Amino acid sequence: MAWHSQTWTFFQGEWHEGNPGIMGPRTHAAWLGSSVFDGGRVFDGLMPDIDRHAARVNRSAETLGLNPTMTAEAIIALAREGVKKFSPGTAIYVKPMYWGEADGPSTIMADPDSTQFCLCLFEAAMPPAMGGLSVTKGLYRRPSLETMPTDSKAGCLYPNNARI
């Protein structure tokens, strides 16, 4: 799959087509990793568990010390609105995200009141049904709660997983 497919992003009260710039070089999340996301799917006209994904992104934001700016219900309503921008039958990935924009009391902490939100929806085909699955053990392990915010869907966790 190409890294960029049909995409709609809700940011600062408006829908933007494509991949809009939403962070700058001073954005806390861009250099210190204060970002969270969640990911739901739309397929076959269904949007299963979107309520759980919306609630979890808010919990993840709080875990990272960010102040969520949207209710789960508002995220769900925006997702339903955004899905209408795609052709019927399109498989869509639904990705609500929060991040710290400004430094907080210390440079390494984000200012909770600077929390930004966007909802990104993009075309993403469902993977083909598989006949089986292979697993292996890698050299790296997932960090544990005393070293990383593993009780959240924090963006800072995923580069380590990609090394496996």
Q: Predicted segment positions?
A:
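Helix-start/capping segments and mature chain N-termini
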Residues: 1-69, 77-81, 99, 108-164
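Short, acidic/charged, Gly/Pro-enriched secondary-structure junctions
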Residues: 76-104
